[in-house]
């Protein structure tokens, strides 16, 4: 009796095991998630007057024919190609250049090259913010010239006649080893501090004051409306 019961229980257990679905295999593991890859790039050029920024910008545009170059200096070129700097319009010129860069980013242009002196991290912050908003990778570039911090040679080479004394003071204020993080979190000094620094510089009539503020959308009378890059490539419509 007991043997018959055990035999029946064994057959029942075997039937139950046979009716149970086989265990599911563990889910297949796909490849590890890829790090974000930027498809668009913003080059922020930095350097003292005469260090070779414009030459570097042209070389980048040669390497990347779709590149657009934006320089605050463009604001002060007249239609006949002459350069006429007005220090009272400099902050407006920076704001104008930032608008052009912003429009190009919204249109997905890549790469975009900003050809300014960019002495301080905070001066590049508007462009870094734009890059973050429009998914651009920021690449900082300086000219690789042997004279890029040689004040006497810079005074001789720069095309706007910036004197040696002014370049020396710019060199002393130049921030080295900037990063995207430091630029993004940089604080703009107060207007009083910026004016104090401006008044301490010798007057040269050259356009090398990298300041940024929000100003009305207007252009200087007599300045060209075709906003092409007067020292190199062309980008109509910006």
UniProtKB/Swiss-Prot annotation:
Gene3D superfamilies per the UniProt record, alphabetical: P-loop containing nucleotide triphosphate hydrolases
Induction: Up-regulated by USF1 in 3T3-L1 cells. Up-regulated by FOXO1 in 3T3-L1 cells.
Transmembrane regions listed in the UniProt entry: none
Alphabetical list of InterPro entries matching this protein: NEDD4-bd_p2, P-loop_NTPase
Composition bias, Pro residues: 20-31
Keywords for the protein's UniProt record, in alphabetical order: Developmental protein
Record's compositionally biased regions (Polar residues): 192-212
Pfam families registered for this protein in UniProt: AAA_33
Region of interest called Disordered, as start-end residue ranges on this chain: 1-36, 183-212
Biological role stated in the UniProt entry: Might play a role in adipocyte differentiation and triglyceride accumulation.
Subunit-level organization: Interacts with dynactin subunit proteins, including DCTN4, DCTN5 and DCTN5.
Name under which the protein is recorded: NEDD4-binding protein 2-like 1
Gene: N4bp2l1
